[in-house]
Design a protein with these regions (language model features):
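Short acidic, glycine/proline-rich loop/turn micro-motifs
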Residues: 13-18, 82, 111-113, 191-194
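Extracytoplasmic small-molecule ligand-binding "clamshell" domains
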Residues: 1-72
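Short, well-ordered beta-strand segments
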Residues: 2-5, 99, 118-120, 161, ...
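Periplasmic-binding protein-like
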Residues: 7, 92-102, 127-131, 165, 169-229, ...
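Acidic, polar ligand-binding/catalytic clefts
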Residues: 44-113, 186-187
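Bilobed "Venus flytrap"/periplasmic-binding protein-like clamshell domains
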Residues: 9-10, 22-39, 76, 97-146, ...
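A ligand-binding cleft/hinge motif common to bilobed small-molecule-binding domains
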Residues: 57-58, 72-84, 130-133, 154-155, ...
Length: 239
């Protein structure tokens, strides 16, 4: 099973720097392993895993072109994407926040505080759309991966990063100079659903994926993975 992903999106997917093969690990990879396990049981043969770790933009193109079997990349199932791919049930819901330098946090009490400021985001993501459409008067810097967006913030090239709260946690643990500010995003964009994408026309596979998601949710595995991989990511990021 070929999995498209974009490492650097902790705790969903990131490179394990302690592994000899620089394996991609995280919440999404753990969920992918469960899907492979269920698919192997159904087919009666061992299904192998191949991870195509590129960029989020390349991931989207690969799924739309039916070049991969599945995309696990902390992705939101927005209507625009549904034209080119099918989505699983939602397996995680998270709040969208703005991460800033702790020293500047007091000046950001609402989204209007970011007028004439620079916001860094990951390219072709929900967060990019939020920055472009819901933050008045900001300049948007789009990077291929979220660590590069965070680097813009820590090197004073950006004033904030629109980021999912789950993804922010490893950075906040590893760097006490960063915080989530008090400014709340508009209600219609504040919360993000996360789902799995597959090429169109794979209804049976999608059904198996949804069964796996429900089993993992019922067993509390997804929450467990978030805690586990946030901790690992923070340790590696700090190191």
């Amino acid at each position: 099973m070929v999995i498209a992903t974009a490492s650097g999106y902790m705790p969903y997917e990131f490179v394990d720097i302690t592994s000899s093969n620089q394996d991609v690990i995280g919440v999404d990879m753990a969920l992918g392993d469960k899907i492979i396990e269920k698919l192997s049981d159904k087919l009666g043969v061992e299904v192998k895993k191949k991870v195509e770790d590129t960029t989020f933009t390349a991931n989207l193109a690969a799924v739309a072109a039916d070049q991969v079997d599945i995309m696990l990349a902390g992705m939101s199932p927005i209507e625009e994407r549904k034209q080119n791919m099918d989505f699983s049930d939602v397996y995680l819901k998270a709040e969208q926040r703005i991460m800033v330098r702790k020293a500047d946090a007091d000046q950001y009490k609402d989204i209007d505080s970011f007028n004439c400021k620079t916001i860094a985001v990951q390219k072709n993501t929900t967060q990019e759309k939020i920055a472009q459409n819901s933050l008045p008067g900001v300049s948007v810097t789009s990077m291929e991966k979220i660590p590069l967006a965070v680097l813009e913030l820590t090197t004073n090239k950006a004033d904030g990063v629109v980021i999912e709260s789950t993804v922010a946690q490893p950075y906040l643990i590893a760097n006490t100079d960063l915080v989530l500010c008090d400014a709340e995003l508009p209600e219609d964009v504040r919360y993000k659903d996360t789902a799995i994408a597959v090429p169109k026309g794979n209804e049976d596979f999608l059904e198996l994926i949804n069964e796996t998601i429900k089993e993992c949710q019922d067993e509390g595995l997804i929450d467990q993975w978030i805690e586990e991989y946030s901790s690992i990511a923070a340790e590696q990021n700090a190191g």
